[in-house]
Curated annotation (Swiss-Prot):
This is Tryptophan synthase beta chain. Its cofactor is pyridoxal 5'-phosphate. Its EC number is 4.2.1.20. It catalyses: (1S,2R)-1-C-(indol-3-yl)glycerol 3-phosphate + L-serine = D-glyceraldehyde 3-phosphate + L-tryptophan + H2O. Belongs to the TrpB family. The modification N6-(pyridoxal phosphate)lysine is found at residue 86. The gene is trpB. One of its GO terms (cellular component) is cytoplasm. Pfam families: PALP. Keywords: Amino-acid biosynthesis, Aromatic amino acid biosynthesis, Lyase, Pyridoxal phosphate, Tryptophan biosynthesis.
Length: 391
């Protein structure tokens, strides 16, 4: 039986209860078989184009970098059906689940975008859908919660996203007819590889589009990092392009020194979490610390193993942006470009703007993966601005 590589350097693996191993092995083989099946590939690409709306646009910003010599492009995953890049992976996972003969899916979600994607993909391919969401995020992501309720069977709440992912894994192990949609490029093998392969369309399109527009590759591609699915989707096709910098942006929250952040890559320690070996936010006793970010989708205490490996070998750089910086970028792109970006994407955007302003005379070509739209965040942003007297 063919096997995928379970590790990225020292990171990754399959640290799960024995009861889950057969399901993961079955999934791995089903994914390999699907990838080798031209009919599966054709159906997946057809759904991406005719249902999801790919290819997404590559938009040159007109005003954000005025006064500098930076050309900043946005890869518009916010224009994808469902409102974010999550649609790419759930369509693929849904087709695999259907191929495996599953009748239902279970998924966890933070900001709700993976939940929305899971619900729409399940409705499309005819699978029952149960979504588990942290109680805190149910409150701050009410628009996405209602969208999920329109399409999904049930949305029970947990206390935190950390608990939600563990509940989803536990429920998955209880029945052979259920397929688990994992929401990011993390977790036990083979999920990091599966999610990357269904998301790599982002980077593949970006490469073709930027070559057509500029006649060369960008100097850097940037993406926000929670678990890392949108970033690895952007990075995957550029990893072998040595002259293209890969820059991931973690949430610094209220400041790295406050411990209220979600930056395990640069400020965590290697541990075992969510079925994988990866950098992890831990206290002095080795217990998992709660992550924090104004952005629900980046509020995750660990990170995908391929990002950990890219960081370890120096192929990618990982920086951090605070809540305040992300909020400023959120407002800036709205006022200057007429785009309401997700708070997640605003972290990457904030770092790109910072790069342009640090050296305004430097000629550089940057691409930010605008991973989702900000409709879901408008109530959060309104509350924050109101508290600061900025409205």
């Amino acid at each position: 039986m063919a096997k995928l590589n379970a590790y990225f350097g020292e990171y990754g693996g399959q640290y799960v209860p024995q009861i889950l191993v057969p399901a993961l092995d079955q999934l791995e083989q089903a994914f390999i078989d699907a990838q080798e099946d031209p009919d599966f590939r054709a159906e997946f690409m057809s759904l991406l184009q005719e249902y999801a709306g790919r290819p997404t646009a590559l938009t040159l910003t007109r005003n954000l970098t005025k006064g500098t010599k930076t050309k900043l492009y946005l890869k518009r995953e916010d224009l994808l059906h469902g409102g974010a890049h999550k649609t790419n992976e759930v369509l693929g996972q849904g087709l695999v689940g259907k191929r495996m003969g599953k009748s239902a899916i279970i998924a966890e979600t933070g900001a709700g975008q993976h939940g929305v994607g899971s619900a729409l993909a399940s409705a499309l391919v005819g699978l029952k859908c149960r979504i588990i969401m942290g109680a805190k995020n149910l409150e701050r992501q009410s628009p996405n919660v209602f969208r999920m309720k329109l399409m999904a069977e049930s949305i029970p709440s947990s206390v935190t996203l950390k608990v939600a992912v563990n509940e989803a894994l536990r429920d998955w192990s209880a029945t052979e007819t259920t397929h688990y949609y994992l929401g990011t490029a993390a977790g036990p093998h083979p999920y990091p590889t599966i999610v990357r392969e269904f998301q790599r369309i982002i980077g593949e399109e970006t490469k073709l589009q930027i070559l057509a527009r500029e006649g060369r590759l960008p100097d850097a591609v940037l993406a926000c990092i929670g678990g890392g699915s949108n970033a690895i989707g952007m990075f995957a096709d550029f990893i072998d392009e040595a002259n293209v910098r890969l820059i991931g942006i973690e949430p610094a929250g209220k400041g790295i020194d406050t411990h209220q952040h979600g930056a395990p890559l640069k400020h965590g320690k290697t541990g075992i979490f969510f079925g994988m070996k990866a950098p992890l936010m831990q206290d002095s006793y080795g217990q998992v610390e709660e992550s924090y970010s104004v952005s629900a989708g980046l509020d995750f205490p660990s990170v995908g193993p391929q990002h950990a490996h890219l960081n370890a070998i120096g192929r990618a750089n990982y920086e951090s942006i605070t809540d305040d910086e992300a909020l400023e970028a959120f407002q800036s792109i709205a006022r200057n470009e007429g785009i309401i970006a997700a708070l997640e994407s605003s972290h990457a955007l904030a770092y790109a703007i910072k790069m342009a302003r640090i050296d305004p005379d430097k000629e550089q070509l940057l691409v930010v993966n605008l991973s989702g739209r900000g409709d879901k965040d408008i109530f959060t942003v309104h509350q924050l601005l109101e508290e600061r007297g900025a409205l």
